[in-house]
């Protein structure tokens, strides 16, 4: 029994010198990046600075993973989410970046335990990171690393949030909401459907497997729940803004002095309109590139939800 286990481990793409080198190099890179920024741009003993430092590794990882996912996202969109036409780039991109992500998860727990232990939540920190380390290594072992890298585009909202946390002037709830809904809801739903097809179940190159589909669909309810909370939060924020504007209008009418800059109000309206157009264009692109059978199935599912 142990001989078979050892033989399987030796044959696994996880147990190679290249993977070990990538992991060590990535760990060293995160160490240098964190300490370089923590001791310069984000130095200081204030609580606000500590909160900013806790987002250094997450923001850096999210940016790198998003950029690395683009070749796979492009191929999926171009070929209607057909995995048979997606070049995996396993050795040159998918496997190294998967290990890079594992190194981030380990680094965040390691350096977080040293520098910002009280900011590491048990569920979203220890449980989440540990579970993803195991999942990524298993997907790498099964030859599914390129599918994981395609899903890494869902790190865009994490990067947007990280930038906003480290630089409050750049914080944008609109940008976060747009990227979250377009990647973790729309793109994720299309990814789930694609992994249920024969080509999707054969992404490992050997036997067909439902495991990638099951893994992706298990995470989806969490994204839907987060999206629900996000929409509710935006609705409350929008209601508050309307109340503030109504109060400002009353004060303006009473005093006869304009309290808001008309040019600024117009710029805000144009910004909201641009965000709506970007989101609508992304949804239309995903919908138009999906096969007809998928669109029909998704439409039927939406109708069934409406009638519940």
Regions found by a protein language model. Name each.
Residues 94-211, 230-237:
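Multipass alpha-helical transmembrane domains of eukaryotic endomembrane proteins
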Residues 306-308:
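Conserved small/polar residues in nucleotide/adenosyl-binding loops
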């Amino acid at each position: 029994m142990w001989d078979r286990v050892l033989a399987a481990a030796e044959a696994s793409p996880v147990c190679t010198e290249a993977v070990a080198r990538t992991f060590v190099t990535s760990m060293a890179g995160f160490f240098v990046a964190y300490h370089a920024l923590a001791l310069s741009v984000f130095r200081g003993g204030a609580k606000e600075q500590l909160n900013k430092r806790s987002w250094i590794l997450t923001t850096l990882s999210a940016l790198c993973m998003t950029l690395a996912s683009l070749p796979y996202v492009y191929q999926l969109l171009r070929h209607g989410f057909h995995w048979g036409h997606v070049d995996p780039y396993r050795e040159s991109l998918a496997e190294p970046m998967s290990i890079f992500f594992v190194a981030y998860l380990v680094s965040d727990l390691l350096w977080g335990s040293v520098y910002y232990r009280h900011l590491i939540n048990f569920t979203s920190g220890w449980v989440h990171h540990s579970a993803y380390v195991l999942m990524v290594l298993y997907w790498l072992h099964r030859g599914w690393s390129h599918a994981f890298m395609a899903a890494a585009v869902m790190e865009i909202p994490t990067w947007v949030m990280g930038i906003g946390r480290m630089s409050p002037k750049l914080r944008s709830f609109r940008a976060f909401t747009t990227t979250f809904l377009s990647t973790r809801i729309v793109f994720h739903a299309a990814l789930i459907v694609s992994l249920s097809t024969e080509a999707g179940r054969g992404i490992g190159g050997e036997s067909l497997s439902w495991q990638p589909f099951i893994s992706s669909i298990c995470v989806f309810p969490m994204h839907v729940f987060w999206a629900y909370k996000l929409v509710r939060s935006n609705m409350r924020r929008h209601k508050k803004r309307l109340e503030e504007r109504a109060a400002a209008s009353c004060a303006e009418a009473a005093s006869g002095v304009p309290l808001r800059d008309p040019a600024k109000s117009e710029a805000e309206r144009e910004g909201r309109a641009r965000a709506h157009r970007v989101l609508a264009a992304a949804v239309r692109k995903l919908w138009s590139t999906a096969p007809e059978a998928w669109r029909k199935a998704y439409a039927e599912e939406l109708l069934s939800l409406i009638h519940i």
